[in-house]
Amino acid sequence: MKPSIYSLTRNDLIAWTIEHGEKKFRATQIWDWLYRKRVQSFEEMTNLSKDFIALLNENFLVNPLKQRIVQESADGTVKYLFELPDGMLIETVLMRQHYGLSVCVTTQVGCNIGCTFCASGLIKKQRDLNNGEITAQIMLVQKYFDERGQGERISHVVVMGIGEPFDNYDNVLKFLRTINDDNGLAIGARHITVSTSGLAHKIRDFANEGVQVNLAVSLHAPNNELRSSIMRINRSFPLEKLFAAIEYYIETTNRRVTFEYIMLNGVNDSPENAQELADLTKKIRKLSYVNLIPYNPVTEHDQYSRSPKERVDAFYDVLKKNGVNCVVRQEHGTDIDAACGQLRSNTMKRDREKATAGTAQ
């Protein structure tokens, strides 16, 4: 299977072009066609020779994704189900925010982190996405807006879809540098957020990369016992190790860390839990922020339900009284398969049922 040309960084593309007997400026032309003009075939690159276009076609695909399903919410949220060249399925979500268009990308096919409340882990990790497959998600969503002709552009990216980004570290890093490139999509680093479930050693590595993107940590519990019971990763990276890495990140980058905290009724949403969370984050309060997330129920995890508004409000009040910077996240796409991984999981279930029915006939 040929790789997507999106899998090449700009430096990779320059090296490949020179290696194949062309001048460096040809790489600049290709990059411009891909990310500024956003063409979907090499034939549209009209300032390249036919022989060079043939060489590109021989070695690369442009966009490796095929659109399977699109769900649009009443609030303007759009959820895409894309099929990869090997038939695997991934999700991408577009959210309309007051500050612009934000896209949430997937980094792995399935997830091995094992959070007990999450739809993403219903199907175990089958492989990493390469950086071209991650970039292609942005390009296909942007293509939709280009075709509408209203001049709308993706302004923000969150790496919070299916999978653990830091478990696919190198590909995610290449993706970040591609979409941030001033000569391409030029999405500002401070408009990009990467979320991790808590791979402490990778947080330290990320601190040393010099990228100015935002970091979010999926915390979801304020003590080791509770966090280990709902997030298996805490057994490998308990809170002491995780927070040591977070403190290192803040000291190294002087950048704020956001904590994601999903509100599970009767599990992690008591005033006592809120006080524990305030105490846990006290040392880094000036450069941390807590995002309280309403839970989107998942059929396969029916032991969990959404915290009622009064419990969320009480939790929020405790945090605010302790001086914690926090917000209750605005919901998106509640009338479609809203939970991360849910559309993919439901589609795969329907595909299996159809296959079984066909075999029975």
UniProtKB/Swiss-Prot annotation:
Residues where [4Fe-4S] cluster binds: C111, C115, C118
Role summary: Specifically methylates position 2 of adenine 2503 in 23S rRNA and position 2 of adenine 37 in tRNAs.
Record's keyword terms, sorted: 4Fe-4S, Cytoplasm, Disulfide bond, Iron, Iron-sulfur, Metal-binding, Methyltransferase, rRNA processing, S-adenosyl-L-methionine, Transferase, tRNA processing
UniProt record similarity statement: Belongs to the radical SAM superfamily. RlmN family.
Alphabetized HAMAP family for the sequence: RNA_methyltr_RlmN
UniProt-annotated binding residues for S-adenosyl-L-methionine: G163, E164, S195, S218, L219, H220, N296
GO molecular function: 4 iron, 4 sulfur cluster binding; metal ion binding; rRNA (adenine(2503)-C2-)-methyltransferase activity; rRNA binding; tRNA (adenine(37)-C2)-methyltransferase activity; tRNA binding
Matches recorded under CDD domains: Radical_SAM
Chief localization: cytoplasm
GO biological process: one example: rRNA base methylation
Localization per record: Cytoplasm
Radical SAM core domain mapped to chain residues: 97-335
Positions annotated as active site in the UniProt record: E91 (proton acceptor), C340 (s-methylcysteine intermediate)
Enzyme's top EC category: transferase
Matching InterPro entries: Aldolase_TIM, Methyltransferase_A, RlmN_N, RNA_MTrfase_RlmN, rRNA_lsu_MTrfase_RlmN/Cfr, rSAM
Cofactor info, note text: Binds 1 [4Fe-4S] cluster. The cluster is coordinated with 3 cysteines and an exchangeable S-adenosyl-L-methionine.
Cofactors that this protein relies on: [4Fe-4S] cluster
EC number: 2.1.1.192
PANTHER family cross-referenced by the UniProt entry: 23S RRNA METHYLTRANSFERASE, RADICAL SAM CORE DOMAIN-CONTAINING PROTEIN
Catalytic activity: adenosine(2503) in 23S rRNA + 2 reduced [2Fe-2S]-[ferredoxin] + 2 S-adenosyl-L-methionine = 2-methyladenosine(2503) in 23S rRNA + 5'-deoxyadenosine + L-methionine + 2 oxidized [2Fe-2S]-[ferredoxin] + S-adenosyl-L-homocysteine; adenosine(37) in tRNA + 2 reduced [2Fe-2S]-[ferredoxin] + 2 S-adenosyl-L-methionine = 2-methyladenosine(37) in tRNA + 5'-deoxyadenosine + L-methionine + 2 oxidized [2Fe-2S]-[ferredoxin] + S-adenosyl-L-homocysteine
GO cellular component, one term: cytoplasm
Intrachain S-S bonds: C104-C340
Further comment found in the protein's record: Reaction proceeds by a ping-pong mechanism involving intermediate methylation of a conserved cysteine residue.
Name the UniProt record assigns to this protein: Probable dual-specificity RNA methyltransferase RlmN
